UniProtKB/Swiss-Prot annotation:
<dbReference type="GO" id="GO:0004515">
    <property type="term" value="F:nicotinate-nucleotide adenylyltransferase activity"/>
</dbReference>
<comment type="similarity">
    <text>Belongs to the NadD family.</text>
</comment>
<keyword id="KW-0067">ATP-binding</keyword>
<keyword id="KW-0520">NAD</keyword>
<dbReference type="InterPro" id="IPR014729">
    <property type="entry name" value="Rossmann-like_a/b/a_fold"/>
</dbReference>
<keyword id="KW-0662">Pyridine nucleotide biosynthesis</keyword>
<protein>
    <recommendedName>
        <fullName>Probable nicotinate-nucleotide adenylyltransferase</fullName>
        <ecNumber>2.7.7.18</ecNumber>
    </recommendedName>
</protein>
<dbReference type="GO" id="GO:0005524">
    <property type="term" value="F:ATP binding"/>
</dbReference>
<comment type="function">
    <text>Catalyzes the reversible adenylation of nicotinate mononucleotide (NaMN) to nicotinic acid adenine dinucleotide (NaAD).</text>
</comment>
<dbReference type="InterPro" id="IPR005248">
    <property type="entry name" value="NadD/NMNAT"/>
</dbReference>
<comment type="pathway">
    <text>Cofactor biosynthesis; NAD(+) biosynthesis; deamido-NAD(+) from nicotinate D-ribonucleotide: step 1/1.</text>
</comment>
<dbReference type="Pfam" id="PF01467">
    <property type="entry name" value="CTP_transf_like"/>
</dbReference>
<dbReference type="GO" id="GO:0009435">
    <property type="term" value="P:NAD biosynthetic process"/>
</dbReference>
<keyword id="KW-0547">Nucleotide-binding</keyword>
<keyword id="KW-0548">Nucleotidyltransferase</keyword>
<keyword id="KW-0808">Transferase</keyword>
<dbReference type="InterPro" id="IPR004821">
    <property type="entry name" value="Cyt_trans-like"/>
</dbReference>
């Protein structure tokens, strides 16, 4: 059993990981006072992506992008095999640390949370933390009606709006536009080479 007791989980495809992800991780650690934040790249996303980079490449990029004494890059979802469902990741780290973890996701995810695998079980087994994205929350009323009493348990992270997205980075590469400053300098060349294919 691990003795660290304030644990965060920041999962995603990280396709590719970018500076926005790094900012989010730093704010989460500071504002939630986390002892440890796990960065957990998705192995097989529930919703298939045609341009998903191989897990090993995304994992390597995450190790370069995220660093610090309170961060650990986890390959749990690869080791588990199969489709990566957030609930099982939360349950794994909850059992590992004997604590209720903080699960961090983007504000835009709330618009379709009812499509997540056993989403009510997920919300009941973690502190569900949402960071702001560049959107106007047109779905807030819909989300409240879906989650009902669980909506009030959501923690909204007070952090700067993130104007960078992985899909925008991939699009810019296809259009031969610069991504300088959007990803870690040490992975920029590899990211451009991979998504240019």
């Amino acid at each position: 059993m691990n003795t660290k007791n304030k644990i965060g989980i920041f999962g995603g495809s990280f396709n590719p990981p970018h500076i926005g992800h790094l900012i989010i991780s730093q704010y989460a650690i500071e504002m939630l006072q986390l002892d440890l934040l796990y960065i957990v790249p998705t192995y097989i996303p529930p919703h298939k992506s045609n341009d998903l980079a191989p897990f090993e490449l995304r994992f390597k990029w995450c190790k370069i992008t995220f660093s610090g004494p309170h961060i650990s890059i986890s390959d749990y979802e690869k080791n588990r095999q199969g489709i990566s469902y957030s609930l099982y990741t939360v349950l794994y780290f909850s059992q590992l640390h004997r604590t209720k973890p903080y699960f961090i996701t983007g504000e835009d995810s709330l618009s379709y949370i009812q499509n997540w695998h056993k989403y009510r079980d997920l919300l009941e087994n973690c502190h569900f933390v949402v960071y702001p994205r560049y959107c106007n929350k047109p779905y807030e009323e819909h989300t409240r009606s879906v989650l009902k009493e669980l909506y009030d348990s959501i923690i909204f992270l007070q952090a700067p709006l993130i104007q960078i997205s992985a899909s925008d980075i991939r699009k810019r590469i296809k259009e031969r536009k610069s991504i300088k400053g959007m990803v870690h300098p040490q992975i920029e060349k590899q990211v451009i080479e991979y998504y240019s294919l």
